[in-house]
Amino acid sequence: LIMLAAVLGYAFVDGYTKFLLLAAVQGACFGLATTAGITVAIDITTSARRSAGNMVYAWAARLGMLVGVVLGIGMYRMYGFRMVTYLSVAAGLASIFFASRVYVAFRAPIGVSLCNMDRFLLPRAWVPAINMLLIAFVPGALLPLMFVGDYWSLAALAVLVFITVSFMKMFVKLSHHCQRGTANTTCHLSMEAGLLVGMTVACHLMDKAQIYHVASVAAMLAVFFFVLLTYPYYKKKQVR
């Protein structure tokens, strides 16, 4: 509800600072909701099917992001930013309704410290996390170009969806039995960080040729990083 209130606030905000504050609130709430969703997806599946549950959740999340971007751009061009905001809030309310229909048996936490990061970062997956960040940087850098009529970023996002699912399997196989949710969250965070860094760099450069140059360099670095570092590391460290 806090995230939806922040999204609704976009329609009435009147300053850049206020916009950033709302975005920070939305991002924090989205991160918590994503982590909770991953945990629920694992808890409601049997032990033998939890890896498959991870994959289904990953596909749903990536496809939702891709469809959301396309619909958002279309609605913005036809009806303006305020209508996009209202559509986002409606989608959020629908997600709350569907989440409320899921029954999860209560399990009291055991030995939980006051502050820990075990639900967010998987140390064993730091190498593929960096690789995922480099890959996501490419569509992130190309996304702002859609506002000048260049839609190659949609193709890059589609490629990112398929690559991320394969990477998700890698993250899960690097995790131990009780760390599948953490593996999923780490993959999400590294991908989202790459998109954010890419968009930030593109907005800073403000030049189409330079943006394509930087995106091309990042794509080549991602390929070499995977071949030389990520894949050998994965083959050495995988546990299943």
Region roles according to the model:
Residues 32-45, 162-176:
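Intracellular juxtamembrane helix-capping segments at the cytosolic ends
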Residues 150-167:
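C-terminal transmembrane helical hairpin of 12-TM major facilitator-type secondary transporters
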Residues 89-108, 225-233:
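C-terminal membrane-cytosol helix-exit motif in multi-pass small-molecule transporters
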Residues 77-90, 204-222:
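A membrane-interface helix-boundary motif in multi-pass transporters
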Residues 2-14:
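C-terminal ends and interior cores of transmembrane alpha-helices
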Residues 126-127, 131, 136-147:
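Helix-loop boundary and gating motifs at the non-cytosolic
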Residues 103-132:
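Juxtamembrane intracellular "pre-TM" segments in multi-pass secondary transporters
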Residues 22-60:
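Cytoplasmic helix-loop-helix junction between adjacent transmembrane helices
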